């Protein structure tokens, strides 16, 4: 079975495909998650060895600091899965909502995208439509920011923090930074700061293939 772009669709559940790809990789791969952690939790349930086979597990999820009690969409959508994944032994690198939200795209970026190739023009049109329908001047780039942790820390800086996972808020998975040594806390490489101008330039230069005009 093929999709509209000519790519072959794999009929297996996502968890089975991920397990096979990781186990067959010649070098430890980076596993990236930019949505609810349901599939990753299923992978770890079916094949606990995967936690030790990946170079890192990069996740966009969680919220620290002000507003943390509200939680964050990706973890809240499947709190049980989030508990399994964040409590695992996988080498997690976490890009949190409170840091990744600082990088945005807005109307100026729409025009730059539309001035590039057909694919970028399409992206610019979609961004413009989203901003108009949401009635907002800009939108945060949560996922692209978090995914830079898979490459380097040129844009998003992280530190190993002590994180509590078992905050009792029904229907949510809330994480909290706690003092070192608190029982039940886990150590996790977590985002703490972002270089917004550098990330924005990197994203737009990469997508359009050209540096910003002066």
Regions found by a protein language model. Name each.
Residues 1-6, 130-134:
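Short glycine/proline- and acidic residue-enriched helix-loop micro-motifs
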Residues 2-102, 107:
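Active-site histidine-anchored catalytic micro-motif
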Residues 1, 64-65, 126, 182:
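Generic signal for short, ordered secondary-structure residues
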Residues 76-80, 88, 95-214:
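Conformational coupling and interaction surfaces
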């Amino acid at each position: 079975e093929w999709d509209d772009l000519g790519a072959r669709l794999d009929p297996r559940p996502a968890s089975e495909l991920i397990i096979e790809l990781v186990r067959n990789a010649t070098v430890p791969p980076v596993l990236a998650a930019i949505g609810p952690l349901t599939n990753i939790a299923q992978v770890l349930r079916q094949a606990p060895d995967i936690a030790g086979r990946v170079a890192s597990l990069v996740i966009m999820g969680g919220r620290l600091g002000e507003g943390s009690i509200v939680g964050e969409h990706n973890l809240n959508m499947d709190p049980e899965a989030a508990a399994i994944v964040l409590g695992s032994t996988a080498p997690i690198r976490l890009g949190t909502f409170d840091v990744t939200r600082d990088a945005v795209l807005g109307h100026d970026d729409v025009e730059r995208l539309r001035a590039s190739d057909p694919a970028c023009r399409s992206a610019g049109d979609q961004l413009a439509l989203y901003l108009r329908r949401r009635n907002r001047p800009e939108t945060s780039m949560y996922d692209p920011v978090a995914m830079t942790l898979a490459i380097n820390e040129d844009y998003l800086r992280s530190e190993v923090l002590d994180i509590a996972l078992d905050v009792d808020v029904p229907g949510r998975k809330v994480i909290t930074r706690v003092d070192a040594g608190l029982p039940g806390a886990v150590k996790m490489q977590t985002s703490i700061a972002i270089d917004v101008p550098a990330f924005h330039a990197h994203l737009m230069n990469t997508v359009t293939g050209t540096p910003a005009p002066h």
